Amino acid sequence: MNRLPFGYIKLRLAGRKANPMTNLIHHWSGGSMNFTWESLVLIVAGVILLRISGRKSIAQMTSTQTVVMISIGTIIVQPIIEYSLFKTLIAAAIFTSTLIVMEWIQMKSNTIEKMLTGKAKIVIENGQLHIENLKKMRLTADQLEMQLRLHGVTAIQDVKIATLEANGQLGIELTDDAKPLTVRDLKKLIHPDFINKDGQAQSGNQNIFDEVGKKNKKNVPKKLH
């Protein structure tokens, strides 16, 4: 049997009518697209993916969440240049799924949570700076004072304990003398009999700042650690 020349086969294949499904796959995987329609699809996809992954602001994100969100934003923009929408949506979905899985694992394991997210560090205790922790966190005294001012604190001596949280925010507990007057305090002044009852109730309350130093988590469900 005589074999057909290779060039003849190429010409026959080029002349065939393309399969509609092949055209659709080629269109979604890298073909030319309308710029306006492409941009709208990417915006909607980005909003949906970020909505699924969480509603935290950038200031409240941990380092892992920030890296993933920046990566998603970078990936979503790529089709504008590379014209590959289908692969982009898959990659962004993978990033989002990875973030959700990582957060689920952190809820199940304290060790992995500390490794990926970190834990709160005490930076001020009884009006004194924790120099070593400040060095580890690469936080200067000026930056710490700025955070204190944003919380309305005018003197470090008024701070009983201050912690730098995993998301970069500062948690502050003031000394008893520096705390603002509350309804509980007014009841103590107006109703002397309330002091004993309130004292008993207050002694049973757990201070969430104790969890940082003493690792006390008695009231936290096991599912949330």
UniProtKB/Swiss-Prot annotation:
Q: Give positions of region: Disordered.
A: 197-225
Indicate how the chain sits in the lipid bilayer.
Multi-pass membrane protein
The answer on whether this UniProt entry bears the keyword Cell membrane reads yes
What Gene3D superfamilies does UniProt report for this protein, alphabetically?
bsu07140 like domains
Main location per UniProt? membrane
Stretches with biased composition (Polar residues) = 199-208
Per the record, where are the segments of Basic residues compositional bias? Answer: 215-225
One of its Pfam families is DUF421
Q: Where in the cell is it found?
A: Cell membrane
Q: Does the keyword Lipid biosynthesis apply?
A: no
* Keyword terms, alphabetized: Cell membrane, Membrane, Transmembrane, Transmembrane helix
Q: Which GO terms describe its cellular component?
A: plasma membrane
> Where are the bilayer-spanning segments?
30-50, 66-86, 87-107
User: What PANTHER family does UniProt report for this protein, alphabetically?
Assistant: UPF0702 TRANSMEMBRANE PROTEIN YCAP, UPF0702 TRANSMEMBRANE PROTEIN YDFR
Family according to the record: Belongs to the UPF0702 family.
In Swiss-Prot or TrEMBL terms, this protein is called UPF0702 transmembrane protein YdfR
Source organism: Bacillus subtilis (strain 168)
Which lineage ranks, top first, belong to the organism behind this chain? Bacteria, Bacillati, Bacillota, Bacilli, Bacillales
Q: Which gene encodes it?
A: ydfR
